[in-house]
Amino acid sequence: MKFTVFASLFASAAAFAPAQQAARTSVATNMAFESELGAQAPLGFYDPLGLVADGDQEKFDRLRYVEIKHGRISMLAVAGYLAQEAGWRLGGDIALDGTKFADIPNGFAALSAIPQAGLIQIIAFIGFLETSVMKDITGGEFVGDFRNGYIDFGWDSFDQETKLRKRAIELNQGRAAQMGILALMVHEQLGVNILPGV
């Protein structure tokens, strides 16, 4: 856990170090993704590590899929973390031995408090979702399109401009949630609560 804290501190300190001059890539390569969703103000297209410098669309789509998926998971993680900090808990027992949901602490401490059989069930359920339910539709409308005949929420009733705007909102909120859950985890390990009144 301390390694995670130090790694995040090092990464944030590196943001203020003088930047090295990287080799210039061709304008044509960078232009390949400048009009993609997510290349928004104020940064525009941002690829400091050059992950898609070769202009490979398949690689870009895979990275975008992973970014969207991690963003969605992070949004749920932030909401869950804040709900638990607010005192909202499931009723009943988490295990047959009488351990209640209310007895499970927040954050990393929950991993050691949940019975091993419960952790195995959680991992198995996530594996089931990964392999069977939450799969990117081959030939879907866009990368990260998980509609599988059951999940729609009226998406098909929106016009193209509205769909693009909503996808941009989801992408930005997912990026913010990834930073948010990381900040909550780092501060938890530092023993500093950043939530007001808690």
Curated annotation (Swiss-Prot):
The way it spans or sits in the membrane comes to: Multi-pass membrane protein
Transit peptide (residue range): 1-31
Q: Per its UniProt record, what InterPro entries does this chain match?
A: Chloro_AB-bd_pln, Chloroa_b-bind
Q: Name one Pfam family in it.
A: Chloroa_b-bind
According to its UniProt record, where is this protein mainly located? plastid
Keywords assigned by UniProt, alphabetized: Chlorophyll, Chloroplast, Chromophore, Light-harvesting polypeptide, Membrane, Photosynthesis, Photosystem II, Plastid, Thylakoid, Transit peptide, Transmembrane, Transmembrane helix
Molecular function terms from GO: chlorophyll binding
Fetch the Gene3D superfamilies from UniProt. Chlorophyll a/b binding protein domain
Known partners and oligomeric status: The LHC complex of chromophytic algae is composed of fucoxanthin, chlorophyll A and C bound non-covalently by fucoxanthin chlorophyll proteins (FCPs). The ratio of the pigments in LHC; fucoxanthin: chlorophyll C: chlorophyll A; (0.6-1): (0.1-0.3): (1).
Q: Any idea what this protein is called? A: Fucoxanthin-chlorophyll a-c binding protein B, chloroplastic
Organism of derivation = Phaeodactylum tricornutum
